[in-house]
């Protein structure tokens, strides 16, 4: 195989927690890890421009294979010169495989060895997605990091079902590698499945490591399981993965889960949470989250977070943002989205600094105490 387009550089381990500080090198630049990746489902991070994402120091964003396959279609993106040119983003892009959307959005699906028959969630048309098709679409999109097409089992799932699912995901992963025809330009990550069963996670990791992917994702978490289950699964799964490859926990983006994931050896995270809740008027602050629709902000002329130096907090007040959100003004959604993404990207910078200083455990305690996670009945984000 030619030299891998995706390379992980280990920098240091936190003596207090074992968390990793590293750097991922891609054809479109490098980024330090642990990293949070904003989600740009349809080749746009909702309400944000690429320039704004760069201003908050996003080194990599995620786009969605399933959605781009349906609209505008991978051929149009390819004709534009690939996803980077299409959306005017010259930093790294990761595309998911479409597997999660097939299993979560489509009410009518039939899984067989060849792939999955399902219905388009927009118009009900019959569609078929296979490992080969997922690779064809992602090769056309031209992302830096592609994901293997996996089966996404429901939570909770019976052991026997999960065992069959893991075996199929391993077979599909091999088919993805064989179908991936731009291996010198795009890195393909395998996805470890197995639910909360340690022996199945072990088998899944073993199968995928034998195929020598340039990176590995941990799938099947953040699907409704309690936080302690997720942490337990990470504790026995991340040590199975190679130390010289990046580890990506899919679909995780609440502040507590980002910190706890980093402590358990995860390098990369993505989630729609910060952008989705922003559009409902909910924002992160160092002292917990706020709902900007709340009447108590009507005459509150402070910034969302007095410690935050983002564009929103430097220029606008809670009262103004509440007014915009209540009037359904697009600018309000832009301001809350900007702040939430900046908050999580800055949080990951704090996590990386704490690893450098061997004090991530202390940082976790300080952050959880201020944010309110230690209170009884604390919300998850």
Swiss-Prot record:
Tagged with keyword Calcium: no
GO cellular component, one term: cytoplasm
Enzyme Commission identifier(s): 2.4.2.29
Pathway: tRNA modification; tRNA-queuosine biosynthesis
Gene Ontology terms, MF aspect: metal ion binding; tRNA-guanosine(34) queuine transglycosylase activity
Top-rank lineage group of the source organism: Bacteria
Catalytic activity as recorded in UniProt: 7-aminomethyl-7-carbaguanine + guanosine(34) in tRNA = 7-aminomethyl-7-carbaguanosine(34) in tRNA + guanine
BP GO annotations: queuosine biosynthetic process; tRNA wobble guanine modification; tRNA-guanine transglycosylation
Positions in coiled-coil regions: none
Signal peptide coordinates: none
Cofactor, free-text remark: Binds 1 zinc ion per subunit.
Keyword Zinc: yes
UniProt cofactor(s): Zn(2+)
Amino-acid positions noted as binding Zn(2+) in the UniProt annotation, renumbered to this chain: 308, 310, 313, 339
Xref: SUPFAM superfamilies: tRNA-guanine transglycosylase (SSF51713)
UniProt keyword annotations, A-Z: Glycosyltransferase, Metal-binding, Queuosine biosynthesis, Transferase, tRNA processing, Zinc
Active-site residues, Swiss-Prot/TrEMBL: 96 (proton acceptor), 270 (nucleophile)
Region named RNA binding: 251-257, 275-279
Binding locations of substrate: 96-100, 150, 193, 220
Quaternary context: Homodimer. Within each dimer, one monomer is responsible for RNA recognition and catalysis, while the other monomer binds to the replacement base PreQ1.
Entries under NCBIfam families matching the protein: Q_tRNA_tgt, tgt_general
HAMAP family found in the cross-reference section: Q_tRNA_Tgt (MF_00168)
Function description: Catalyzes the base-exchange of a guanine (G) residue with the queuine precursor 7-aminomethyl-7-deazaguanine (PreQ1) at position 34 (anticodon wobble position) in tRNAs with GU(N) anticodons (tRNA-Asp, -Asn, -His and -Tyr). Catalysis occurs through a double-displacement mechanism. The nucleophile active site attacks the C1' of nucleotide 34 to detach the guanine base from the RNA, forming a covalent enzyme-RNA intermediate. The proton acceptor active site deprotonates the incoming PreQ1, allowing a nucleophilic attack on the C1' of the ribose to form the product.
Family, similarity comment: Belongs to the queuine tRNA-ribosyltransferase family.
Descriptive protein name: Queuine tRNA-ribosyltransferase
Organism for this UniProt entry: Bacillus subtilis (strain 168)
């Amino acid at each position: 195989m030619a030299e891998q387009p995706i390379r992980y550089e280990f920098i240091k381990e936190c003596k207090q927690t074992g968390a990793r500080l590293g750097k991922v090198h891609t054809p479109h630049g490098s980024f330090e890890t642990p990293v949070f990746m904003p989600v740009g489902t349809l080749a746009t991070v909702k309400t944000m421009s690429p320039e704004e994402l760069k201003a908050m120091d996003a080194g990599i964003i995620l786009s969605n294979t399933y959605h781009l396959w349906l609209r505008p279609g991978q051929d149009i993106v390819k004709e534009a010169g690939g996803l980077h040119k299409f959306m005017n983003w010259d930093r790294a892009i990761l595309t998911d495989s479409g597997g999660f959307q097939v299993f979560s959005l489509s009410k009518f699906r039939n899984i067989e060895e060849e792939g999955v028959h399902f219905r388009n969630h927009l118009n009900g048309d019959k569609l078929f997605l296979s490992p080969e098709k997922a690779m064809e679409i992602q090769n056309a999109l031209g992302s830096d990091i592609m994901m293997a097409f996996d089966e996404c089992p429901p939570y909770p799932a019976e052991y026997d079902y999960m065992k069959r699912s893991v075996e199929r995901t391993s077979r599909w992963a091999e088919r993805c590698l064989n179908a991936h025809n731009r291996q010198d330009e795009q890195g393909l990550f395998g996805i470890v499945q197995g639910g909360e069963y340690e022996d199945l996670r072990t088998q899944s990791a073993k199968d995928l490591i034998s195929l020598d992917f340039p990176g590995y994702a941990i799938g099947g978490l953040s699907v409704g399981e309690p936080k302690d289950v997720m942490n337990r699964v990470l504790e026995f799964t991340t040590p199975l993965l190679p130390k010289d490859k990046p580890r990506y926990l899919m679909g995780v983006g609440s502040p507590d889960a980002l910190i706890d994931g980093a402590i358990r050896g995860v390098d990369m995270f993505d989630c729609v949470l910060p952008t989705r809740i922003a559009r409902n008027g909910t924002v992160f602050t160092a002292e917990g989250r706020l709902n900007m629709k709340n009447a108590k902000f009507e005459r509150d002329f402070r910034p969302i977070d007095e410690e935050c130096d983002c564009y929103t907090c430097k220029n606008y007040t809670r009262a103004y943002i509440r007014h915009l959100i209540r009037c359904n003004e697009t600018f309000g959604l832009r301001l809350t989205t900007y702040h939430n993404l900046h908050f999580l990207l800055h949080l990951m910078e704090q996590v990386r600094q704490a690893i450098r200083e061997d004090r991530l455990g202390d940082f976790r305690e300080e952050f959880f105490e201020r944010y309110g996670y230690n209170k009884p009945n604390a919300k998850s984000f």
